[in-house]
Amino acid sequence: MIPGELFIQDGEIELNAGRKTVTLSVANTGDRPIQVGSHYHFFETNPALKFDRKKARGMRLDIAAGTAVRFEPGQTRDVQLVALAGKRMVYGFRGDVMGKL
């Protein structure tokens, strides 16, 4: 074995298997690009992003860890969100929750 070497089984790896998901249409109404990282609480994203925030509470982008989605000014795109796991407590970000979901 080589340090850092990975042994991966054949087949597909499904991210976030079995978790609740929702697809939302998101519009950037601002004049600057907005980038949202994989583990950012989507409910608390930049107010220039217009979407159903109620449905996004407790959710994050359903993308690989360490990646992001960029919304250009005037752009509307559909994104899939996935439920946050663990203790489902949210602190920081924009300070809109600061506790249990």
UniProtKB/Swiss-Prot annotation:
Pfam families (alphabetical): Urease_beta
This protein's record includes keyword Oxidoreductase: no
SUPFAM superfamilies: Urease, beta-subunit
Domain of life: Bacteria
InterPro entries xrefs: Urease_beta-like, Urease_betasu_sf, Urease_subunit
Main localization (coarse): cytoplasm
Record EC number: 3.5.1.5
Subunit organization: Heterotrimer of UreA (gamma), UreB (beta) and UreC (alpha) subunits. Three heterotrimers associate to form the active enzyme.
Protein's UniProt name: Urease subunit beta
